Amino acid sequence: MVSTMEPAHHDRVLAIVSHLPHLLAFTICGTADDLEGESRQEVLQFAATGFRDFTRIAASDPVMWRDIFLNNREALLEMLARFMEDAQAMARAVRWGDPAYIEDKIQRGRVIRRSLIELKQA
């Protein structure tokens, strides 16, 4: 299937479904790598399915992704800012013990994931 869209819209869509996930995967791997000695080894030893699945794309070509990030920086930074706001809101909910907010966000994530499966995108 071929879709057409305006270039700016394309950049925003790809920023959220491709570029931001790669940036997050590279970053969480970097965070794990920066842990001190024993903790770093334990991260590798005890990495559960979620960490392995989430970070699979961190094995991608660093030069290619550097160029993608820099050539699409405006859309990527816009989506990163939105993500950071959402992550901060989730952090506040965890800190303040807001189970309704946390559950709502998890539920919304499940809906998106199930939609991908139904569309045979997963």
Regions found by a protein language model. Give the residues of each.
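A short hydrophobic/aromatic micro-motif that marks alpha-helical segments and, especially, helix-coil
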Residues: 24, 87-89, 112-114
